[in-house]
Design a protein with these regions (language model features):
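Positively charged
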Residues: 1-146
Length: 146
């Protein structure tokens, strides 16, 4: 396992749409472990593959309840509203208030290739939606409440 370089705001890779993961192989499993290690080292709660320069539809999250891996995620449903401050490992030191849905239902594959659905509220919903945005080239500053 190794720490990966977190791409910072201004890097073109952060604005690109990611491709689906076609195969969960040894290289992808190493990437997932590296992403988790990098996220924990940076005191983050989430990290998406484009943040380490990989244009794959993959992100990891840990809000304190253990790591979650999302491969080829889909957002099925959202509802409600919440406004809270967000930050991003690609924009160190920047915090802004962002309105997001308070509830999300998502579907993805885990690192074993098993499909799962998750229902989340509050911080976990915010983290899922924040990381999902990265896969489409969107940063939280694009959603700042003006």
């Amino acid at each position: 396992m190794a720490l990966r370089n977190i791409r910072k705001y201004g890097d073109d890779v952060l604005r690109k749409e990611c491709r689906e993961v076609e195969e969960i192989d040894k290289r992808l499993l190493v990437l997932i472990k590296d992403m988790l290690e990098t996220m924990y080292d940076a005191d983050g709660v989430g990290l998406a593959a484009p943040q380490v320069g990989i244009l794959k539809r993959l992100f990891v999250i840990d809000i304190g309840d253990g790591p979650l891996v999302f491969i080829n995620p889909e957002i099925i449903e959202t509802s409600g509203k919440q406004i809270d401050e967000e930050g991003c490992l690609s924009l160190p030191g920047k915090m802004e208030e962002v309105m997001r849905p308070n509830y999300v239902r998502a579907r993805a594959l885990n690192e074993k290739g098993q499909e799962f659905e998750i229902e989340a509220e509050e911080l976990l919903a915010r983290a899922i939606l924040h990381e999902y945005d990265h896969l489409n080239g969107t940063l939280f500053i694009d959603r700042v409440n003006k």
